[in-house]
Amino acid sequence: NDLKKILVNKKIGKIYHCKIFYGNGTSRLVKKSKWRDKGKGVITDIGSHLIDLCLYWFGKDFKNINIIASNKFENNSPDHAIIKFNIKNIFIEIEMSLCMWKNTFRCDVIGSKGSAHLNSLCKWGKNFFELRERKLPSGQPKRKVFKKYSLKDPTWKLENLYLKKLIKKRYFGNLKNDLIINSFFKKI
């Protein structure tokens, strides 16, 4: 949410590129699953979440989608992949892995006036969100760390409350983003 506000308010200027890495160590669990170790593997498993983030932050105009790497280190389906694409002239690279022995999430968004950096998720230990203001013509940027904390995973509780609220309102969903994500995967 903090990153979305920074992007909307153009705090880091014109966005040049974004790099996201998301990895966990579930390759052996996936290998034991008949339905998970099939098809595009980690690309549709973890990749769907990364594409959803890109939709939220940058929009849906996906162009020039290319798989840079697709590896089957321990599984029958890909357990590591790197994909690059563009949204609104922003170069985006996403990397996903089931062979990362400590759960890891990193995101770097680089713009003309600075950059924004996310490191980890609170459920996996200390995390932070950092904003760097570009120094011209060059030099060490002015840094501001917004959040640095470690919590138990709050997402399940929040998702459960959100789901109950939707049920009370009799709202049964919108598949628009799911269809966009599905069309992304059909292009690779």
Per-segment meaning from a language model:
Residues 1-74:
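Predominantly a Rossmann-like dinucleotide-binding segment in NAD(P)-dependent oxidoreductases
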Residues 161-188:
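C-terminal helix-rich "cap/oligomerization" subdomain common to oxidoreductases
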